[in-house]
Amino acid sequence: MKIVFIITSSGDAYYCGNCFRDNLMAQAMKRAGHEVVIMPIYLPLRQKEFQADTPLFFPATSYYVGQKFFKKKPMPAWLKKLLGAQPLLDIAMSMAGTTTSDGMEDMTLSMIHGEGTTFDDMVREMIDWIVTKEHPDVVYISSSMLVGIAKALKQEFKKLKMALPPKIVCVAQDEEVWIDGLREEDATLAWRGIAENLKYADAVITTSLYYKEKMASLFNAVHVVYPGLEIEKYATEEHPANPTIGFFYRMNKADGLDVLAEAFVMLKQKGSVPHLKLRIGGGYTSNDKPFLRQVRKVLAPYKEDVVIEDTYDWAHHAAFYKKVSVICVPLQFEESVGLYLLEAFATGVPVVEPDEGSFSEIVGNAGLLYHPNDALHLAEALEKLFTTPGLYEQSCKAASKLSAERYNCCIVAEKLEEIIKTI
């Protein structure tokens, strides 16, 4: 079957979990023999492993300006073309990665409700491309915050009286991270709009039982499809000579890098894990630089035992995990899956994570969970993993087993195929 994946881009400067998840799902379906079309919105895709197959739709620059200044009349064609040009998109990409939805209320609500002059203009272009050029069997919408597109597509399919209209699959994952940052009245409108417009999706999927249960009041009949990897890319006999803690996600406060830095310093001062090292990767944006300077100051007494990778590329993912003994990303919010965990498991590397969100479901015996989520308890958990006889080896075996049996791209493709066949 032919599947159009409508996906958002973060600018590719750092490890974006949602972007990587979309890539994994698209690649899994492609490996299973399906025709996959990648349709980006907001920002261009730059990673060579995940290239677009269509033009960019809803360019972030022109969509933002349209929502701000052209609510009652269409944006002039010349301005729309200028704002969507590569130089301005490059500027937007350099500023991408904000962790706040402040100032983005109009864009967010318009995309969820599927309403507004600018939305109508831009979704028309997208629909025309899908209907006249792609003729897909399935349209996969990568976030419920794009559900206004599902509404517009369904209405168009009905208008065209298509005998076999494409099925629409929509993903629900971690929406609250963005929506709950809106003003209270806007957040209420956003959740209400998602709940209302998900009826236009033929199937709704999410990445964990935890998130399905958390959002049960909003998302009915949600299917759980765990992300899956090409585990052969991660398989290795390589292991670091010294015990090495790895952090591989966006280097910011929300993802807890400062907590890990403090825990690492505690362990070095205690000396209970000889020759302990720390490797940090995953990229960052210009907004994260002041925070990173503070982290470097904390780690300064042990800088000879710390490696911070300043560049980020999807091609380097597997290589990073082969250089660490354990992965730890002490998130400061509840996440619905955590793809860095699955990558660690595929490499046979255990994890140490806070006992929050989906982590108890995702991790199982492939590592340790700790509570509360602070540097002291993180340090204690890491110390336990490295110093308890046999525990590290048992966790490594459990990680590899979990990867093969649950987080395998072949299993993921089969699961999504089953869901599509039922709708």
Regions found by a protein language model. Name each.
Residues L292-A315:
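Nucleotide-activated donor-binding/catalytic signature segment of Leloir-type glycosyltransferases, i.e.
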Residues Y210, G228:
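Carbohydrate-associated surface elements
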Residues G390-I420:
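A charged, aromatic-enriched C-terminal amphipathic alpha-helix characteristic of glycosyltransferases
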